[in-house]
């Protein structure tokens, strides 16, 4: 065994062995318990970042641990390869997105493999490959047949200069990110998936996911947004020219008598009707079309509106209510209209105040009145007043009674409403999965026959930013109608990339199956036992995946109900932010690795300078690692300098997995020192003792060795629980570090001590092997020549070693530590109390004082109260 720890040599040796032996190839074995561990697959952006390293190390630790527990483990990897960034990069570099994507995949694959991940690379997939997205297309056609996919118009962001649709993130302050043109809202035909058909099941099944964080389940429940309320119909006031009745859904029917106006979205048919004869309204509608589309944005933007001059009739009082167009009403939610109760809704209050509309209070607190005029909306449940025959009722009785009255008049009824909307999957983009439909003048919309799938995306196009390249490529869109044979045109929209990621975890079970979407192997591996990914995917990706798997279940393709049994959402990786402000006020960011910190004599930070020019830079606190802030750390450089095991160890030790991790160079260096110490401890032991020939004789151990062996087996039990149940990798590592510190203090060189050292080091290598597998692979070969670490089971704590003859008790005086005593484990309490009172260190604090009582926590401490 060489004396020094050289991570590059060691990691090369281990990885070569794993590759040559196909160590992590997963094969179905019905007689074995399976464990399917999956970290969310990455977008091939070009290089790994530290968030990737953390994500995939967590999954690898769990995979390796369960392998040692006897499970048949599957840990695959693939690439979420379609998407807008590839198109942007293609425009910048004048290369097809396909080349950019495949080059990135090749580079990132090498990076991942350098981390020593126990993955079955034979199951690798990329969503941009035709043999993958063929099945997107196939299932989409099945959904069309079942009515779970359909075509209707939808509103999109439109850049009038580039003549292209923009994603929400491409709209910056109302303007296109590339051209700076004011973005318009256009209504175009789009395809939707009917996720609302599964709304109830998606909501109720959250209760069957105890292995998911409560926060994620709550976020999904809120997104689905099931609410119970009343659908109210406000009859049209024909004299005002109102063309139709207005339907409104409300969860606060108790406030119906406080309605002072009705507001509609700019896209509502009533708004369009009113604008035909009113240029000012038409201009306002156009302004709204250039505004925000997202609910979160609407909540913060200034409330604006225009009176249409149209009226509806209050369904119970008969009062005429003005109809306004308001920019805070979304067409995509409810009926695109709201009944406005300014006294009891914050948005309505703000709007009514802005436009001097009436504010009529009809709800008051249970135990007090309301001060009128209101300074703000009173939004709590309370007691109705000024509500005719419904005055004096609490919330639910008022809602029930008003719903009955509306139903009797044919102007309303109780309804269940969902915030969830159907999933619009059409994207007017090139780099995505083609939608398998053909438009024929004679036959209409014609599905591509199954035998003609996949509709292959051409991979040699280079986007220029002006529209969808597919719509300008006749070789793609020109085709013959499958029904009549006449000339026809392919659909040039592509699918939302969330479609690709909604079922990839299923395809891993059978990536070599080319004749069907799935096969029987799916029934063995699925559902995923442990899924790992960022909290930012809590809603869309996870919800769409749950929906997609339920559709596949109902089509008879899979047996499971929920795709992910357990979910771990790892925290972000943070680093310092360093910057300067230029004379023009622009902020220039610098990587913290290029900055020298200045400290005073006490080591306190007093400043920072850029190493390149020696000039000061400002510290902007701690923030998520990102390209925009230039505060990332290159994993490749870290691995090259310290080795993959150091990177893995730091990532697992620096923070519990669900919490944010603050980057610290000192922490990385500390992890490296620990591995060097582990290597040296094994080296020194083998130099002194050689390889052990057999188990140590435990019967004759003295007190010191017994205590050390107790700590060893206590550590084995703790680490197993920390890794397998609690997933607190940092505390598992800390326990091993404490054990190593204790071993380092051992001066005994007797055969028993050397035997105990061998037992301890073997178990330490086993315990650490899921976290730092390379060094452990090599150390095991040194400790146990002729055997391989991968063949070893997880160590089990020796119950006999955990039975203590002697225990150490803490002695407190008034709750403060004042001494320690060692006693036999079966010592009677009265003797323990006497020994505590007689302890020399303790006596200094109690001499001359009256002892009021002695409190004992068996096996732990004695507290003397004076």
From Swiss-Prot:
Q: Which UniProt keywords apply?
A: Aminoacyl-tRNA synthetase, ATP-binding, Cytoplasm, Ligase, Nucleotide-binding, Protein biosynthesis
Q: Which domain of life is it from?
A: Bacteria
Which Gene Ontology terms cover its molecular function? aminoacyl-tRNA deacylase activity; ATP binding; leucine-tRNA ligase activity
Q: Which organism is it from?
A: Nitrosospira multiformis (strain ATCC 25196 / NCIMB 11849 / C 71)
Q: Does the keyword Protein biosynthesis apply?
A: yes
Q: What is this protein called?
A: Leucine--tRNA ligase
Q: Which GO terms describe its cellular component?
A: cytosol
The sequence motif named 'KMSKS' region is recorded at 624-628
Q: Where in the cell is it found?
A: Cytoplasm
Extent of motif 'HIGH' region: 42-52
Matching PROSITE patterns? AA_TRNA_LIGASE_I (PS00178)
Reactions mediated catalytically: tRNA(Leu) + L-leucine + ATP = L-leucyl-tRNA(Leu) + AMP + diphosphate
What Enzyme Commission number(s) apply to this enzyme?
Answer: 6.1.1.4
Family label? Belongs to the class-I aminoacyl-tRNA synthetase family.
Write down the NCBIfam families for this protein, in alphabetical order: leuS_bact
GO BP, sorted A to Z: leucyl-tRNA aminoacylation
> Does the entry feature the keyword Protease, yes or no?
no
